[in-house]
């Protein structure tokens, strides 16, 4: 579109690409904006041109003008210089802007390939609609004819003539070329205005002009001359009747153009292949410019742009070309001058050939034309066109001959020409492409003329020009041969017709050959000038075909080859062009002004759609293709070309239009190249024009769509045929048959529809034409019909492209190629038609327009000439397809696409044989009619076969309505339209589908609904049923596969290979993503399917076959089929299965995951089916039949049911766009132990997920055993919340989706919200419930499916209640998780008794605790603590060793030594197995400490803590003794087993005793679970156990010493000692915890020992914090679930600590001394003891807290750790144990190690500062940070700062802890470990160590109690804290005493151990000893004994002997206290109530 071109001029180069694609749209908009009037176009063009003129200076710079090589001041912008600025600006610029856009773009793009691509794009998407192009072509032909007639006619006449010529050329294959040629001509027209003025002044004077042009802008003038010649030639061709006029104008125009062309070609050939290469470059550039110079003004700038591009591309070539250009310019001057005298000289050839060349050169040009024409038309078409051309000119016969020869050659060379022609076409770019490839300056010259005819003759003209260049008119045959040689050189594939040119092409391709070819090119230019002058009208006519083929061929090959060749050529040409154009611009601008007036009339008419409203269809198309030329000529072309030329030469216009179409597409394809050539040719061309050229080129790029659009987008001067209103900036469509334009609104076409029509090669045919076409179908002669058909094909293609506009430029390229093929035929057709008369041309123009808009319609109803032409067009396209296949094998795939398009058109014609048996392509009307008939026939047949009582008239009406709706829906008869029609046809015809057609006929399914029905809805019931069966089968297979997969361990492929996935977090994340996507996919599938089925159902509602839905594939009466009703499960599931399975598998990382995903999909599908079935029952509710049916009874039941439960969580559930409400979570199944901590305050629902995906995932989780699954029920708090609750429920239920929580805490791997309707079945994966379950009559519920990490949970448990949590989680938790929640809740009341019983019977306690409700747990915290200790003792023996690795693998991953040395409690193992440390830990607590830890252990802990404050002594005495005995036994066995793997047997017996009170967490890996349980269960044997533990402790002390050396290397030795002091079972727990805590605090040690369990638990940091912080926290908030309880507990503990501060201070003093002694060991001991004490009892925790506080003052490190731990406990107690555990373990322990957690806790920091040796990184402070900071369990505690302060204080402790936990600072050998241990657990551990000496004295009991304390502490905060609340407080008292004693000892030991810890081996040994001592001390003495033993051990911990001696001492003290503890513990066991009361 002209305006678009103008806009393109303004488009910056950086936006050129966008402009290319937006060009068509811009054109539409621009056309709308400027189509109102030519003046608007002209003004806008002028304005834009003025912008261009500024662009000459600035805009061009902005638009890559710097790229332009021609800065020649003489080179004037066609727009602004000689050529009428209005003319140039209006039309030349407009067209050129489009062409220049491409040109500029190509200028920007150094590769000619890009330019070719751009050209292709432009060719494919011409600015104007095919009609407009054809009209403009016709107009251009007419105008060219007029110009030719007037010869020296004014610019307007010249423009008209040129425009016409160009239009015809564009109509032909060369219309695109012509656009290029015109663009070049326009570019050269400025010089060529001088040229053409001269040329117009003298026919032979054109030679002068040409010399001038060749000198100043040889290429631009050549292109303009060529354009002029082409225009004239086309006019003469089109005006074969008026060859004289044509000859004259064409001579004049052609002389100027040909003079340039001849100069170019002559230079090319004269320069030989060298110049041919260079000049062809220039010539193609020139032609490129000519394309650009469709806008004559911009053509120069286009040339310049091309020149710049080419210059940029081949600056060296440009130099050569500039030399050559100079040569050419001189040669052209001489040649032009000589042309008159010398045929050899291009000048003489040009001058004489104006008429002489008509005879002589006519033959060579005919030969060239024939060659190219044959290449394009292939023999017959080429001959015909060239014959016509020859007839048109004196050389028509020679042309025919040459065409025959060339056609033969071309047939042969066409294949080569596909590439060579592409080269030639590239050089000629249409005509310019030929010039480019053939070194076809001739072609550029010819392009102006050949734009009309050159597209067929261009190649010939180029060849002729080459021949002429060599021989001029005298050696026309030789020049033809030369042209062939040049072609062969230029386009090697072109062997025969273009061997010479092929030679030129290769030479062009070869930079070295540029000059040679260039000399040939000069010769050729001269010859071509002659030839072009004489036969160029003929040549133009023929060349369009050839050029088109060449362009087509060229584009595939030449775009690659010529991109380089043309780059060189273009550069050479740009140099030549610039030089020549600059020279000729001055000279030629005057002649050019005239010739350009003619040309502008011809070209602009074509170029400017606004200028060519009447001709717009044809002319516009040609002008779009000629865009560059016509734009300058456009103004005159517009008026004259429209009216006169269009009217006078409709046939010519038609041919021209087809040539233009052909030309334009090839030109557009080649334009960028040719423009480059043109630009290269005229290096002097000011780069200022590049913006225009670029815009033009860009427009060219979009020219096909644009030109098609413009054809049918509209001509600005056109008015709507219906409303008679101007464009009005509205989308207009041009009739494919006539020039009438119609508003899209008026004819019911939208731009998109028009584009679709263009894509489908459909034309819009107005009502008049439709009627006329039917009449005219058979009028045209076979030749005319062929020609018309070809033209119609091309027009149709172009129209299709126009319609496609921006839809698919590739398609337009394909069409362009196809059009090029057909245009080759069109050229002949156009020639023939021109021979036949102009009337046919007009008709053809109209037809072309119509065809372009309605090719389909043409097929059915072409105008008589039209239809004949269409019929032949089909034949010709077939032929041309064959030809194209041969000639375009080298051509781009687009050629094949074009061929396919032809075939499609033919097929369409065949389909619509009614109107035309072989119509080239059926029009949209024809297609629609065919569809109507087909539908009617189908319905009538079905109606006849059926017994329906429906009148046949209704069937016809229905068919018509269906087609109407179909068309209105798709807005076009495009592929979608046809596909839908086929679908409808198939389903309506389907004999099995007896419902659809009945519904359709009955009106049950309206046509509007019918066309929107999905294939499934349309399908028959049988088909639908089959699909469902297949889907179901697929689902079943998937489920089966998943079941198999579930049986297999879940593996994950990593860089290490396949590894079993213990943690499903990554998988689940993937699955969640998958599932989330999958649900979406399922939804999408389900929705369409459901909608389809529902639609079917709606249709079948009349019969309402919904109940029979499964019996039919599709029934419109079936609501399900119609989509009105949710499809049954079977229906949706199969479909879902396919999608979901695919999706799931896609997302899955491994087969298991994929299977799981698929299964999940399947499950989702099944679930969806299930829900669908429910929906069928109650369609409204998807998941739950009722939104939330809550009957009063149900509510009562719910309230009654919930009254028995304690909510475990309260917070917000928020789904941003759905609902937000406050809710409480009640346990349903699984262990709710740490949910309070694990669940965020606000659960953010991040999305939806398919239920099946969730259940598949859950199955995998269950199979993995590493996670624990917990189910909670959310209950709204208020009625308002109930509303939101119901909304959220309905949201998910209606979508059959689950909610996915987006903000899970660390321990919660995944959380899903499950909408469970009151009537919904409980998902099978959830049952049987392991917990309270759900009431029988329930309301609509939102369940929370929580998947937690067992191991991490266990680690958390390990940290705080490592033993307890691990034990329950280890053995029972797996089975318990659901039961734990429910049972724990239920058995909360039973807890005390059960705990006693539990101690009595390990199994019973475990089960009872599992059953105990959390509420009871809260009540039974004290008792729970004891049973938990027992449980811990009972459970630890088994997987403790297993867990170390697992636990280590978790958050605080201990070193291998830790793993090996640290036994993992069973809980840790179970946690690792269950996969959720925190969960397992919670479960363990809930199970083991169910009453204590579960439900609200915090409340119990608080109460217990308070009670213990008062009863702390008693509890500590009784419970702690018993608990400690148990703990000691456990800890002894645990520590022994942990430290001494060899003590597994011994520990087993001991562990068995302690198992009763201790969890398996305390169980050392070495100790068998049975032995450990035996320690737990055998309370009476606890002393013996303590003894055995002492033995074990000795072993463990060795191991602990080793481990402590490892752990204590940083700071684990003291934790180990603490563990040792407490007992190894509990000590292991506490050791693990201490290690965890220490690891968290002093990560290395913790990692070594506690870390494994912590790894098994939540994480070692978590474990540490739980063990240290968690102990106090768990004592305070046994379960971290109630954060308040924890806080209260902390408060209570603090109070207890304060109350017991004295004793705590004593203990802390002892422990401080001990801790200071064992700087790290004592911290870890304190931590262990503290954690154990806290775990054992909240009172002990309080004592520990007090001790810690006391220790802080007494200890520098220990006290600090203690106080810090206390602070941490206080804080963490607020936070869930998990948080505390993580914080304390990972944060506090590590913090203690790293100081950051320690120091965050001010007390600890102070104490740390006070006791730097142990507290630089005090463990207790670390523990407290965990408590204080309450880092979410899932969040690892922050890394501790380097041991700056603390470590400096403990110089003995190496800063980097021996065991560096991930994310945690390594423990320091000395102070680090002390500090980390001191921070939290260390104080506890010291307290326990203090107790440990007591326990050692009372070995089994004290140790067991300590162990129990440790274990409860380790087990779970709630359970352990409850459990510890009594025994732990007793231990605290003992620890206080012990700490007082041991604080000094620990200080001493810590000091000495700091040195030893500096030695990692010693620290490891200390760890091992501590473990043994912890277990020993815990067993021996609850607090003090263990602490004493720890203190004793901590000193020996450094030396194993000392540790062993201390262990013995601790065992003695533990035995002493152990006996007391046993008494106490037995009392606690016997008196669980008292323990509870104490708690």
Curated annotation (Swiss-Prot):
- Region Disordered: what ranges? 144-178, 460-492, 528-555, 596-685, 860-904, 1078-1109, 1171-1191, 1360-1380, 1581-1623, 1643-1684, 1776-1800, 1884-2039
Statement: the UniProt record of this protein carries the keyword Ubl conjugation: yes
Q: Zinc fingers (PHD-type) at which residues?
A: 717-772
Keyword entries, A-Z: Isopeptide bond, Metal-binding, Methylation, Phosphoprotein, Ubl conjugation, Zinc, Zinc-finger
* One GO BP annotation of this record: regulation of transcription by RNA polymerase II
Low complexity composition-biased segments: 473-483, 1781-1797
Q: Where is the composition biased (Polar residues)?
A: 144-168, 617-640
Do you know which CDD domains this protein is assigned to?
Answer: PHD_PHF3, SPOC_PHF3
List residues, modification Asymmetric dimethylarginine: 1867, 1877
TFIIS central domain: residues covered: 927-1046
Q: Name one Pfam family in it.
A: SPOC
Q: In which tissues is it expressed?
A: Ubiquitous. Expression is significantly reduced or lost in glioblastomas, glioblastoma cell lines, anaplastic astrocytomas, and astrocytomas.
Gene3D superfamilies (UniProt xref): Transcription elongation factor S-II, central domain, Zinc/RING finger domain, C3HC4 (zinc finger)
Query: Residues involved in crosslink (Glycyl lysine isopeptide (Lys-Gly) (interchain with G-Cter in SUMO2))?
Result: 644, 964, 1931
Q: Which cysteines are joined by disulfide bonds?
A: none
GO molecular function terms listed in the Swiss-Prot or TrEMBL record: zinc ion binding
Stored PANTHER family: PHD FINGER PROTEIN 3, TRANSCRIPTION FACTOR S-II ZINC FINGER DOMAIN-CONTAINING PROTEIN
The protein's name is PHD finger protein 3
In the UniProt record, the gene name given for this protein reads PHF3
């Amino acid at each position: 579109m002209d305006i678009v071109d103008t806009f393109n001029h303004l488009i910056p180069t950086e936006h050129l690409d966008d402009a290319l694609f937006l060009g068509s749209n811009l054109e539409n908009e621009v056309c709308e904006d400027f189509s109102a009037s030519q003046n608007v176009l002209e003004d806008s063009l002028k304005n834009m041109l003025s912008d261009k003129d500024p662009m000459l200076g600035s805009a061009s710079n902005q638009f890559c003008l710097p790229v332009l090589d021609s800065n020649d001041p003489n080179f004037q912008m066609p727009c602004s210089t000689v050529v009428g600025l209005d003319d140039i600006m209006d039309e030349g610029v407009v067209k050129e802007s489009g062409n220049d856009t491409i040109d500029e773009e190509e200028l920007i793009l150094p590769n000619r390939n890009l330019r070719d691509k751009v050209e292709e794009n432009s060719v494919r998407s011409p600015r104007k609609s095919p009609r407009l192009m054809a009209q403009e072509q016709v107009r251009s032909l007419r105008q060219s004819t007029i110009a030719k007639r007037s010869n020296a006619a004014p610019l307007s006449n010249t423009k008209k003539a040129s425009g016409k010529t160009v239009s015809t050329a564009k109509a032909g294959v060369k219309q695109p070329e012509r656009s290029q040629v015109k663009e070049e001509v326009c570019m050269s027209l400025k010089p060529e205005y001088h040229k053409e003025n001269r040329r117009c002044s003298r026919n032979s004077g054109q030679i002068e002009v040409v010399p001038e042009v060749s000198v100043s802008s040889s290429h631009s003038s050549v292109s303009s001359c060529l354009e002029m010649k082409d225009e004239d030639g086309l006019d003469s061709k089109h005006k074969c009747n008026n060859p004289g006029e044509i000859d004259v104008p064409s001579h004049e125009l052609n002389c100027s153009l040909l003079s340039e062309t001849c100069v170019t070609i002559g230079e090319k050939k004269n320069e030989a292949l060298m110049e041919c290469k260079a000049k062809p470059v220039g010539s193609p550039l020139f032609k490129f410019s000519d394309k650009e110079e469709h806008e004559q003004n911009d053509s120069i700038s286009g040339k310049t742009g091309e020149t710049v591009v080419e210059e940029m591309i081949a600056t060296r070539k440009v130099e050569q070309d500039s030399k050559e250009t100079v040569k050419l310019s001189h040669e052209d001057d001489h040649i032009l001058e000589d042309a008159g005298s010398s045929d050899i000289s291009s000048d003489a050839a040009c001058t004489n050939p104006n008429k002489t060349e008509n005879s002589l050169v006519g033959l060579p040009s005919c030969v060239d034309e024939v060659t190219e024409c044959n290449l394009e038309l292939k023999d017959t078409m080429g001959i015909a066109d060239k014959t016509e051309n020859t007839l048109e000119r004196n050389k028509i016969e020679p042309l025919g001959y040459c065409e025959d020869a060339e056609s033969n050659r071309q047939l042969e060379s066409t294949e080569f020409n596909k590439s060579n022609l592409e080269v030639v076409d590239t050089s000629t770019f249409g005509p310019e492409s030929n010039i480019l490839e053939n070194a076809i300056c001739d072609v550029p010259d010819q392009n102006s003329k050949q734009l009309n005819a050159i597209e067929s003759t261009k190649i010939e003209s180029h060849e002729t020009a080459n021949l002429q260049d060599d021989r001029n008119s005298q050696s026309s045959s030789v020049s033809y041969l030369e042209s062939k040689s040049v072609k062969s050189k230029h386009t090697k594939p072109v062997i025969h017709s273009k061997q010479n040119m092929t030679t030129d092409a290769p030479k062009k391709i070869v930079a070295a050959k540029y000059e040679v070819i260039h000399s040939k090119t000069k010769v050729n230019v001269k010859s071509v000038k002659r030839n072009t002058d004489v036969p160029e009208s003929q040549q133009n006519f023929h060349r369009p075909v050839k050029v088109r083929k060449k362009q087509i061929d060229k584009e595939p090959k030449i775009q690659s080859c010529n991109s380089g060749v043309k780059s060189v050529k273009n550069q050479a040409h740009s140099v030549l062009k610039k030089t020549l154009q600059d020279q000729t611009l001055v000279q030629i601008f005057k002649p050019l002004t005239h010739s350009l007036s003619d040309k502008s009339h011809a070209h602009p008419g074509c170029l400017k759609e606004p200028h060519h409203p009447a001709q717009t269809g044809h002319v516009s198309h040609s002008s779009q293709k000629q865009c560059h030329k016509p734009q300058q000529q456009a103004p005159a072309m517009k008026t004259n070309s429209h009216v006169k030329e269009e009217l006078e030469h409709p046939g010519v216009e038609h041919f021209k239009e087809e040539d233009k179409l052909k030309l334009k597409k090839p030109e557009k394809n080649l334009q960028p190249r040719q423009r480059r050539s043109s630009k290269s040719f005229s290096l002097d061309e000011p780069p200022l024009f590049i913006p225009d050229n670029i815009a033009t080129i860009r427009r060219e790029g979009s020219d096909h769509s644009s030109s098609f659009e413009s054809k049918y987008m509209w001509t600005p001067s056109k008015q709507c045929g219906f409303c008679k209103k101007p464009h009005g900036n509205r989308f207009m469509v041009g009739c494919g048959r006539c020039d009438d334009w119609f508003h899209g609104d008026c004819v019911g076409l939208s731009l998109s529809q028009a584009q679709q029509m263009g894509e489908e090669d459909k034309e819009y045919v107005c009502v008049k034409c439709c009627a006329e076409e039917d009449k005219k179908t058979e009028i045209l002669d076979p030749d005319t019909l062929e020609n018309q058909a070809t033209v119609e094909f091309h027009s149709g293609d172009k129209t299709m492209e126009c319609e496609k506009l921006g839809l698919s430029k590739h398609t337009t390229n394909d069409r362009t190629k196809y059009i090029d093929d057909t245009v080759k035929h069109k050229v002949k057709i156009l020639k023939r038609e021109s021979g036949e008369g102009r009337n046919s041309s007009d008709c053809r123009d109209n037809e072309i327009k119509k065809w372009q808009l309605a090719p389909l319609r043409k097929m059915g109803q072409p105008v008589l000439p039209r239809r004949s032409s269409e019929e032949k067009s089909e034949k010709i396209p077939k032929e041309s397809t064959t030809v194209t296949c041969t000639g375009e094998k080298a051509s781009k795939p687009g050629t094949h696409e074009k061929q396919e398009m032809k075939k499609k058109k033919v097929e369409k014609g065949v389909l619509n044989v009614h109107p035309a048996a072989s119509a080239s392509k059926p029009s949209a009307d024809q297609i629609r009619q065919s569809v109507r008939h087909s539908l009617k026939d189908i319905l009538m047949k079905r109606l006849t076969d059926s017994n329906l009582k429906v009148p046949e008239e209704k069937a016809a009406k229905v068919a018509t309505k269906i087609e109407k709706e179909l068309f209105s829906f798709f807005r076009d008869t495009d592929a979608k339209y046809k596909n839908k029609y086929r679908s409808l046809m198939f389903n309506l015809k389907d004999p099995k589908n007896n419902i659809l057609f009945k519904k359709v006929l009955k009106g049950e399914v309206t046509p509007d609904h019918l066309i929107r029905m999905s294939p499934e809805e349309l399908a028959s019931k049988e088909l639908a049923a089959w699909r469902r069966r297949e889907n179901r089968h697929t689902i079943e297979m998937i489920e089966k596969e998943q079941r198999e997969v579930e049986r297999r361990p879940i593996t994950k492929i990593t860089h290490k290979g396949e590894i079993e996935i213990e943690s499903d977090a990554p998988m689940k994340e993937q699955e969640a993503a998958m599932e989330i996507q999958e649900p979406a996919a399922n939804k999408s599938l389900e929705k369409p399917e459901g909608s389809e089925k529902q639609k079917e159902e709606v249709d079948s509602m009349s019969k309402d076959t919904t109940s029979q839905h499964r019996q039919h594939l599709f029934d419109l009466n079936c609501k399900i089929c119609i989509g009105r009703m949710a499809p049954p499960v079977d229906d949706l599931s199969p479909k879902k299965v396919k999608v979901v399975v695919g999706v799931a598998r896609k997302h899955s990382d491994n087969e298991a995951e994929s299977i799981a995903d698929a299964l999940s999909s399947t499950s989702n599908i099944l679930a969806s089916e299930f829900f669908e079935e429910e929906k069928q029952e109650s369609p409204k509710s998807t998941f739950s039949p009722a939104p939330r049916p809550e009957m009063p009874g149900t509510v009562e039941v719910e309230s009654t049911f919930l009254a028995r439960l304690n909510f475990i969580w309260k917070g917000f559930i928020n789904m941003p766009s759905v609902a937000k409400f406050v809710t409480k979570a009640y346990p349903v199944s699984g262990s709710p132990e740490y949910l309070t901590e694990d669940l965020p305050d606000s659960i953010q629902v991040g999305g939806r997920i398919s239920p099946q995906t969730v259940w598949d995932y859950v199955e995998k989780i269950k199979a993995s055993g590493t996670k624990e699954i917990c189910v909670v029920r959310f209950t709204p708090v208020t009625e308002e919340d109930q509303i939101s609750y119901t909304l959220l429920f309905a949201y998910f239920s209606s979508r059959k989706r689950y909610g996915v929580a987006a903000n899970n805490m660390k321990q919660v791997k995944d959380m899903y919200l499950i909408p469970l309707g009151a009537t919904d079945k409980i998902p099978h994966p959830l049952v049987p419930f392991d917990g309270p379950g759900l009431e029988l009559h329930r309301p609509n519920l939102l369940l929370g499916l929580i998947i937690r990490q067992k191991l991490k949970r266990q680690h958390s448990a390990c940290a705080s209640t490592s033993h307890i949590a691990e034990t329950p989680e280890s053995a029972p938790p797996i089975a318990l998780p659901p039961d734990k929640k429910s049972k724990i809740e239920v058995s909360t009341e039973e807890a005390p008794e059960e705990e006693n019983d539990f101690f009595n019977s390990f199994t019973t306690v475990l089960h009872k605790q599992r059953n105990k409700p959390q509420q009871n747990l809260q009540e039974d915290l004290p008792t729970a603590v004891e049973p938990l200790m027992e449980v811990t003792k009972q459970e630890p023996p088994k997987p403790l060793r297993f867990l170390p690795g697992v636990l280590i693998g978790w958050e605080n991953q201990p070193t291998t030594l830790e793993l090996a040395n640290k036994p993992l409690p069973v809980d840790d193992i179970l946690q690792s197995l269950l996969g959720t440390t925190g969960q397992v830990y919670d479960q363990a607590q809930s199970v083991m400490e169910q009453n204590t830890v579960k439900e609200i252990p915090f409340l119990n802990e608080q109460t217990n803590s308070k009670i213990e404050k008062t009863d702390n002594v008693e509890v500590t005495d009784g419970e702690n003794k018993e608990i400690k005995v148990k703990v000691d036994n456990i800890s002894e066995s645990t520590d022994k087993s942990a430290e001494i793997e060899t003590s597994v047997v011994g520990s087993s017996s001991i562990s068995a005793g302690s198992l009763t009170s201790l969890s398996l967490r305390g169980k050392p890996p070495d100790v068998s679970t049975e032995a450990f349980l035996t320690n737990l269960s055998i309370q009476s044997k606890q002393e013996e156990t303590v003894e055995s533990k002492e033995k074990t402790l000795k072993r463990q002390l060795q191991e602990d010493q080793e481990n402590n050396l490892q752990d204590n290397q940083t700071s684990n030795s003291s934790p180990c000692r603490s563990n040792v002091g407490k007992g190894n079972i509990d000590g292991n727990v506490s050791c693990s915890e201490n290690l965890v805590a220490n690891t968290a605090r002093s990560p290395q040690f913790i990692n070594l020992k506690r870390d494994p369990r912590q790894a098994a638990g939540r994480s070692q940091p978590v474990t540490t914090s739980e063990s240290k912080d968690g102990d106090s926290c768990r004592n305070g908030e046994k379960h971290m679930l109630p954060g308040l309880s924890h806080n209260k507990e902390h408060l209570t503990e603090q109070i207890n600590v304060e109350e017991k501060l004295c004793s705590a201070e004593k203990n802390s003093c002892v422990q401080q001394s001990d801790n200071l002694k064992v700087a790290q060991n004592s911290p870890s001991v304190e931590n262990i003891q503290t954690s154990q004490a806290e775990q054992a009892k909240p009172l002990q925790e309080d004592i520990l807290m007090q001790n810690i506080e006391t220790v802080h003052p007494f200890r520098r490190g220990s006290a600090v750790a203690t106080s810090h731990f206390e602070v941490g406990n206080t804080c963490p107690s607020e936070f869930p144990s998990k948080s505390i555990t993580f914080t304390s373990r990972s944060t506090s322990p590590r913090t203690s190690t790293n100081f950051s957690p320690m120091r965050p806790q001010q007390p600890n920091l102070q104490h740390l500062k006070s006791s730097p040796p142990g507290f630089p990184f005090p463990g207790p402070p670390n523990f407290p940070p965990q408590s204080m900071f309450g880092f979410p369990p899932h969040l690892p505690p922050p890394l501790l700062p380097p041991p700056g302060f603390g470590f400096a204080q403990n110089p003995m402790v190496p800063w980097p802890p021996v065991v560096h936990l991930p994310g945690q600072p390594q423990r320091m050998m000395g102070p680090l470990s002390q500090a980390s241990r001191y921070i939290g657990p260390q104080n506890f551990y010291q307290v326990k160590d203090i107790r440990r000496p007591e326990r050692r004295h009372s070995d089994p009991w004290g140790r067991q109690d300590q162990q129990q304390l440790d274990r409860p502490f380790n087990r779970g905060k709630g359970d352990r804290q409850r459990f510890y609340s009594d025994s732990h407080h007793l231990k605290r008292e003992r620890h206080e005493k012990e700490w007082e004693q041991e604080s000094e000892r620990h200080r001493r030991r810590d000091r000495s151990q700091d040195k030893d810890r500096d030695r990692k081996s010693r620290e490891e040994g200390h760890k091992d000893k501590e473990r043994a001592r912890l277990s020993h001390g815990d067993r021996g003495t609850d607090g003090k004994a263990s602490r004493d033993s720890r203190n004793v051990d901590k000193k020996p911990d450094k030396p194993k002997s000392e540790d062993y001696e201390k262990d013995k001492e601790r065992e003695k003290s533990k035995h002493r206290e152990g006996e007391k503890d046993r008494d106490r513990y037995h009392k606690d066991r016997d008196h669980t109530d008292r323990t509870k009361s104490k708690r």
